[in-house]
Amino acid sequence: MKIKLYNNYNNIERIFYKNLRKENLDNKLEKSVIHSRYMDSSQSIIVPENETLTIAKFPPNRFSEKIGTHPDFIDESLLPKTQYICSIFLDIKGSTRLALKYDLETVQKIKNAVLSTGIEIIRYFGGHIHRLQGDAIFAFTGHSKLLKSDAIIQAINAASVIQYMNQNILKKYFENVLGVSSLKIRIGIDFGDDDEVLWSKYGIDNINEVTVTSLHADLSSKLQNKASENSIMVGENVFSYLQLPDDLLSDIYIKGSSEEKDYYIMKHNSFNYKMKNFDWSKYLER
């Protein structure tokens, strides 16, 4: 990573420090000399409780304050309704190693600090957190007053900065402080247009939620599953709608093969839907 890249995003580390301190991890890990030194060295970085995320070259564009129902559909009388959305599915691998070394309460605090920082980044770029699923985040970008292209860009920005955070901030903390392997974050992004996304209510009485019925929302999870460690996979609608430069996209290979490429996330009769690996590092350095 270039130094200029770190300088652009160093506020992310400050926010991560803040989230760690919120969890009072000093007390839980006080026997760790390395952790004590790490926290002592960060004392010079005074992070006020009210400090919010600020990312150079990316202005804040916060849209949603709550998890669950998308703000466009709080009024359930509007449902069912078709409306585009860009879906982000983020999964964190490797946190189980924490449970082999630390007690459950400590593991929960560490994981929450990581997830909280990821949530703040997604919200910073205009994302809406729809659901937390264990070590995974399911989120949306886009709303009725936002251009579709901007929604896709928001998703790409959020996912790229999260991968940057993992490689440059979390990796250092997990390996040098916690003494475990760094996390592996995989992200899938896909876009469904107006005629490809139906918003409606699922469930009964007081046990229900407003969510989407969309192949492309489902594919964001499948794309995440296809992604390699610390990478982002995007669906065909994403890279074709934005006409992303070829140098930011690459094909992946079928598992176990170094020659046969895996072009499609879904191949069924006449529906052949492509996927690409997105080079988030090169994107951020532009």
Q: What is each residue range found by the language model?
A:
Residues 21-58, 82-107, 151-160:
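Short, charge-rich amphipathic segments
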Residues 53, 126-135, 169-179, 226-236, ...:
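Noncatalytic linker/hinge segments flanking ATPase motor cores
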Residues 73-154:
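Catalytic NTP-binding/metal-coordinating core of nucleotidyl cyclase/transferase enzymes
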Residues 144-263:
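Catalytic beta-strand-to-alpha-helix segment of the class III nucleotidyl cyclase homology domain
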